Amino acid sequence: MTKQFAVIGNPIEQSRSPELHHAFAEKTGVDLNYQKRLAPLDGFESSMRSFFAEGGSGMNVTVPFKEQAFALCDVLTERAQIAKAVNTLWMENGKLHGDNTDGQGLVAAIQALEWNLENTTILILGAGGATRGVIYPLVQAGAQKIVIANRTLARAEQLVDDLKTAVPQAQLQAISLNDLEGDFDIMINATSTSLSGDALQLPEKLQFKYAYEMAYGKPSSFIDQAKQRNVPYAEGFGMLVGQAIEAFYIWNGVRPQLKDFL
C-alpha cells in the first residue's frame, strides 16, 4: 500500500520537499506519495490532525508552524525538546511524535563538504529559531565552542542561557553583531539579512576558514563576501536535502545517501 506523506506550511508553494522525497523513494524502492498542504494561519492543528486521521504516515512542518507543532506533540525527541520546534511528525500507538531534523541536516551537509567539525570554533550569525535548532547537533558532531552573534545582544544571551545545560561539553558565548572579530573555523549565517538590502558587512578583523549560508537559491551578500576573501562556501540546499533524508529515515527505516542528491 502506498504510504501518504505531506509537508504543511503557509506559504507552501515554494517547498521542494515533494520532489526530494519522491527522488528518495525512487532510489530506495519505498512506495509513497508526498503532497504539499497549505494550512490557514489559524488552522494548522485541524489540518494536521485530519491528515493523520485519513491515514497519513508522516508530515513535515515548515514556516510558520514549527513551534505550534512542538506544542502539540505527545512525545518529543531530545533534539526537538532543545530546539523547541518540530519539523517532522508521525503517529505511533495513537500518540503524536515530533522531531527536529534541521540541525542534523546542517551537520550532514557540512560533513558532505568534508569540512571538519571535530574540536571546531563556530560563529553563528543570528539568534532565532534556525540557530536554536542547530546548536545541539553541531555539538554532538564535535563542535567545541559556538559563538552566537545577534543584532540584539540580549536575545543571543538568552539563547546561550537556555542551551548551556543541554550542551555542557561545549562552550557557548553571545556577542553583538557590532563586535564581530576573532578567528573561526566555520561561520554560519542563520539571519535573513543576506536576502535583503539590510546586508551585514563582515569586518576585516573577523577571520573564518569556511562559510555556510543557511538560505539557498537567492542572492546573498554573505556568500559574496566569502567569495571576495577566497573562503570556501556553500549555501543551504545541502541542509535542506540532509533534513529531508533524516525525516525519510525516521518514517521509512532506510537512509538515502546525501551525495546522490546534491
Curated annotation (Swiss-Prot):
Residues where shikimate binds: 15-17, 62, 87, 102, 216
Catalytic function, reaction form: shikimate + NADP(+) = 3-dehydroshikimate + NADPH + H(+)
Keywords, in A-Z order: Amino-acid biosynthesis, Aromatic amino acid biosynthesis, NADP, Oxidoreductase
Top-level EC class as recorded in UniProt: oxidoreductase
Binding site residues for NADP(+): 78, 126-130, 150-155, 214, 236
Pathway: Metabolic intermediate biosynthesis; chorismate biosynthesis; chorismate from D-erythrose 4-phosphate and phosphoenolpyruvate: step 4/7
Single GO BP term: shikimate metabolic process
Active site: 66 (proton acceptor)
Family per record: Belongs to the shikimate dehydrogenase family.
Protein's name according to its UniProt entry: Shikimate dehydrogenase (NADP(+))
Upper taxonomic lineage: Bacteria, Pseudomonadati, Pseudomonadota, Gammaproteobacteria, Moraxellales
